[in-house]
Every structure is written in structure tokens, then in C-alpha cells.
């Protein structure tokens, strides 16, 4: 959006490795310290409400400059976004990347999930326009928060494909029987389905190996499952892997798997495709929308480890299938998920919000 000549300012929380006021590719980024960092981690909603006090105070560093639209990303910044909306008399646009109801399979447990769901509901009510990243999420947000369908807009996520491109043309030659997956290690990400699929392939593909990168609250349970199923020699939990190391890993991999049980969009699918890795995804949420009918990847029913194993075997044992998927994926990324196209669509939502 900055490349198109628009002034963009981002409010965020501070990080020890970055400054509190800097320009990044034409975008001014202001960062605030958390207001009450001593609050226990299980007081998540209170911690975020506290941090929003500091986010709101960042407005004082803008001087006389004022935006025309406020854009909030998820419930985490709902308080500051709504306060600035009232203070400046501006329209509010809210992007909902995922919902607590969706993460819990359509049910909202008591406690923190119920509190977050309430903030999500309030944010979408206060916003003039709402953005969701897939048709699946448009339905979930519209129905779950009882919104007018005219208020909810589809704007897909995107990536900078140049950050993931291989220095050499990708092909199946020299690729290992290696399966790579990465992301937050949470139950809904379905990594437990992948480990079962790898075990199912032990005798069919004796040289198969799998690396799962990432951190999360489900990590200990996933390691326990790996130990109990006796696939520790096949599956490695690598923890956090920096992007440059992940890109090197993707140059060797035979395929990327995104086995999510719930996935509003699935940015990792685009990253895998951009790196030239044949990509297999669960037929769920936004993941299915990315791949369905494009030939850019293979699909399996979420939770079905046997179906996933068959997809992995198909890609690893048929180089022509893998190469065809790469070609289709490159075309898909170039036509649908560029930042310029996404910025133009987002600008249209801003104008809609300004019109009321």
C-alpha cells in the first residue's frame, strides 16, 4: 500500500531486537512496551487489554498527522482500535484471522476462550467493515458474529514469493524422501496426523523421514505420541527453525505437508509452493480453497492419516506429479496472492468503510 503512495503507520508492541520508531519499506512502525508485563501468562485477556493502553498512547507520537481509516488485526488490538476510532471520529476496519469458536470445533469453552470470543464479537460489531482471509472465514465470521453479509469482505493473505524462491530451478532431481511441516505446534494444526502417516509409510517407503519445525503448547503431547508409536527414528521435532534454514530445508524436501484440522487460511501452503516444494494440504477451511481445482497441490481429508500417507507416497514416488504441481503452483501464486493485488482489494474495503 505504501508503494502505491499511501501513508501507512503501524502500531505494535516492542521487541528487544528492533527500534520503537522506524521506517520499514515505506511504512512507519511505532512500538510500545507492554503496560503490565508482570501479569501471569494465563491472564491473557487482561494482559492484552493492558498492552492496549500503551498502544493507544502511541497516537501522541503522531503529532498533527491523522489517518483516514483505522485497521485492527484480530481481537488483540480491539481496545486501542475502538478508542482511537472514537477519539478521531474515523471508520474502523477489522481483520479476523481466526476465531476462538473455530479453534475449538464450533464450541466456545468457558474461561479465556469465552472472554476472547466476546472481544471478537465486540470488535466486529464496532467495525464499519470486516475482512476475512477466505470464503470459509467469511462464512464463519458472518454466521458466528451474526453480521450483515455486506459488511464482511474477502481479502486473501499473501506472501513475498521472492523470499522463498530457490536459487536454482526446482525439480524432483536430487530431492530426498523427506517430508517437511512447520507452524505453531497446536492440536488443531494436525501434526499428530502427519506423524501417524509417516509411521504408516515405514515399510512402503523405508527411507522416508519427516521434520516438523515450530513451537507450541502441544509439543510435549506430540513428542509423547511419537515415542508411543515408535516413530522417533523417522520424525524429528526441530523446534524453532530460522527462515534461512527453513528455506534450505525446503530445497531438499520431497514434499511439504499442512495437515491442519482447522485452518482459516494457511499461509504455510503459499510459502511451500513459493519455495518450489510439492505441497499436500488437508481439505479444510482456507487450505482447501487455495488448492481445490488448481492442480497446485494434493488434498486429503483432515484427520485421515491413511489418505495423507497415500498422497505423500504419490508425490515422492512420481516425479512427474511433483513437477506438475510446482508449475501449477507458480502460476497460482503469480496470479492471486501478490501484495499489490491484495493492497488494491484492501483499499477498496477502506473506501467502503469511509462511505459508511
Residue spans of the language-model regions?
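Conserved acidic donor-binding segment of nucleotide-sugar-dependent glycosyltransferases
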Residues: 293, 298-305, 314-320
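A short, well-ordered alpha-helix in the C-terminal region of glycosyltransferases
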Residues: 314, 321-335, 345
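Aromatic "clamp/platform" in nucleotide-sugar-dependent glycosyltransferases that forms part
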Residues: 261
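Conserved donor-binding/catalytic core segment of Leloir-type glycosyltransferases
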Residues: 171-198
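Short hydrophobic beta-strand element within catalytic cores of glycosyltransferases
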Residues: 278-282
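Carbohydrate-associated surface elements
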Residues: 14, 136, 158
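Nucleotide-activated donor-binding/catalytic signature segment of Leloir-type glycosyltransferases, i.e.
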Residues: 223-241
